[in-house]
């Protein structure tokens, strides 16, 4: 007990404890924002691949390699302010607090003060509607259009008609499942759009919502995203699709063309979307049978007349060329025979056939004898050079009086006549065949229950009425 009484708090036994006090003092001076040894981004990315030096452009502040000495960040966590309006109040059409109404009224005042923005919004809406109408029409691929351009009749039919309907895809086992999933997704989108539209009507009134509904697209999207973030996270994903094709043998071929999911080209080729039936065909059911038959036979007659005229002109040119070649060959043959007779006369006149001939005419007599004894048929058989020369002379004699400009005008006139006549007659035939200018392909009927048909029709009707939140 006496030893315990001699003890005190300020005991002199401090051997081995000085470094503990220093460590405790150093720990008390630590903070989250205290600078440590800076590391290079290569080491950080190598040893901590799950936590890169610059994770994303939205988090560039987390730069561990370039921290400044004079920056000291606060340790407190930033908490977003929570909106007072709950999810139930927004979707149960209950009155919302006054601060949201004040902001919306301020937006209305700004829109009323800027009429130019209204015109821009109306133009954008009209453009969106036109784009949607064009997307609803089944359009062919470039190759099909190029094939149609080569035929003026098909081009006229394409200009006079538009093909509507959905391309019938090959039957698959998962077709019913895909239809049910698509109907469910469309139903959810339609219900969500209707709820947001009712919310606008309840907050602004029917007359204001009908007038400024299109101007509140951004506000509606913000409120929708804000309400959605309360019960589910909002994610943005970028998908890159790599399409790989394989032929019938299973060999992979990598093509740069876009995949034809709807098989539009095959559909157009099989159904002959730009072809009109013959008027005498049993499959021909025109809207106006008399006008369709008249235009069809008129086109056939004009094409026959044009073909006969063109081929008769070409045939007459070929016949005239053959006659000219034959006459030229005969003339050349007569010239060779005449030269041989002249050589024979000179040879006999100068007595080259006698044994004591004249010494001064020895060389000339040899030339006359060679010319007299030659075979003219052998020289006449080599007619390729003569034919080419004659053909060039005929072309020059044909072009020189007419000139190149005249020939070009004649050629362009013939091409214009053939193209324009077939294009116009194809256009008129399509109008007389289809009447309204719309060609439809009905889909093969699939067995469906009446309840599913009713729900699908109600969803489509409500989808046409609701035009909000086009994402």
Curated annotation (Swiss-Prot):
Record InterPro entries: Brl1/Brr6, Brl1/Brr6_dom
Feature: compositional bias, Basic and acidic residues: 115-126
Region listing for Disordered, in residue ranges: 66-135, 167-192, 444-471
Keywords: Membrane, mRNA transport, Nucleus, Protein transport, Transmembrane, Transmembrane helix, Transport
UniProt-annotated location(s): Nucleus membrane
Topology term for the membrane: Multi-pass membrane protein
Residue stretches of biased makeup (Acidic residues): 70-92
GO process annotations (BP): lipid homeostasis; mRNA transport; nuclear envelope organization; protein transport
Family: Belongs to the BRL1/BRR6 family.
PANTHER family: NUCLEUS EXPORT PROTEIN BRL1, NUCLEUS EXPORT PROTEIN BRR6
Subunit annotation: Interacts with BRR6.
Task performed by this protein: Involved in mRNA and protein export from nucleus.
Protein name, as recorded: Nucleus export protein BRL1
Native organism: Saccharomyces cerevisiae (strain ATCC 204508 / S288c)
Lineage: Eukaryota, Fungi, Dikarya, Ascomycota, Saccharomycotina
């Amino acid at each position: 007990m006496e030893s315990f009484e001699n003890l005190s708090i300020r005991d002199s036994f401090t051997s081995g404890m000085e470094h503990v006090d220093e460590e405790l003092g150093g720990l008390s001076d630590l903070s989250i924002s205290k600078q440590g040894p800076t590391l290079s981004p290569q080491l950080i990315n190598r040893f901590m691949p799950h936590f890169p030096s610059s994770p994303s452009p939205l988090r560039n502040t987390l730069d561990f390699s370039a921290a400044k000495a004079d920056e000291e960040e606060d340790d407190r966590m930033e908490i977003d302010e929570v909106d007072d309006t709950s999810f139930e109040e927004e979707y149960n059409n209950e009155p919302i607090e006054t601060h949201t109404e004040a902001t919306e009224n301020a937006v209305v005042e700004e829109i009323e003060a800027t009429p130019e923005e209204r015109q821009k919004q109306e133009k954008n809406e009209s453009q969106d509607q036109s784009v949607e109408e064009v997307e609803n029409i089944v359009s062919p691929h470039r190759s099909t259009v190029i094939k149609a351009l080569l035929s003026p009749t098909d081009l006229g039919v394409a200009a006079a008609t538009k093909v509507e309907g959905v391309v019938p895809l090959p039957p698959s086992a998962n077709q019913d499942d895909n239809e049910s999933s698509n109907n469910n997704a469309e139903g959810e989108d339609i219900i969500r759009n209707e709820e947001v539209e009712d919310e606008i009507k309840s907050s602004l009134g029917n007359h204001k919502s009908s007038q400024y509904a299109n101007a509140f697209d951004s506000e509606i999207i913000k409120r929708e995203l804000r309400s959605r973030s309360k019960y589910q996270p909002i994610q943005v994903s970028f998908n890159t699709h790599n399409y790989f094709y394989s032929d019938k043998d299973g060999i992979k071929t990598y093509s740069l063309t876009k995949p034809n999911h709807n098989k539009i080209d095959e559909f157009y080729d099989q159904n002959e979307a730009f072809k009109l039936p013959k008027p005498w065909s049993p499959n021909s059911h025109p809207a106006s049978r008399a006008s369709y038959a008249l235009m069809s036979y008129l086109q056939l007659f004009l094409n026959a007349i044009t073909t006969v005229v063109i081929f008769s002109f070409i045939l007459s040119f070929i016949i005239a060329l053959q006659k000219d070649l034959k006459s030229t060959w005969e003339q050349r043959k007569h010239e060779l025979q005449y030269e041989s007779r002249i050589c024979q006369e000179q040879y006999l006149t100068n007595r080259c056939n006698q044994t004591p001939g004249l010494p001064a005419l020895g060389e000339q007599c040899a030339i006359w004898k060679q010319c007299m004894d030659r075979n003219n048929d052998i020289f006449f058989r080599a007619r390729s050079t003569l034919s080419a020369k004659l053909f060039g002379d005929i072309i020059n004699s044909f072009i020189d009086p007419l000139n190149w400009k005249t020939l070009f005008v004649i050629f362009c006139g013939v091409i214009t006549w053939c193209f324009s006549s077939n294009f116009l007659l194809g256009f008129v035939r399509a109008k007389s065949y289809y009447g309204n200018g719309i060609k439809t392909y009905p889909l093969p009927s699939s067995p469906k229950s009446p309840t599913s048909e009713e729900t699908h029709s109600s969803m489509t009707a409500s989808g046409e009425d609701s035009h909000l939140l086009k994402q």
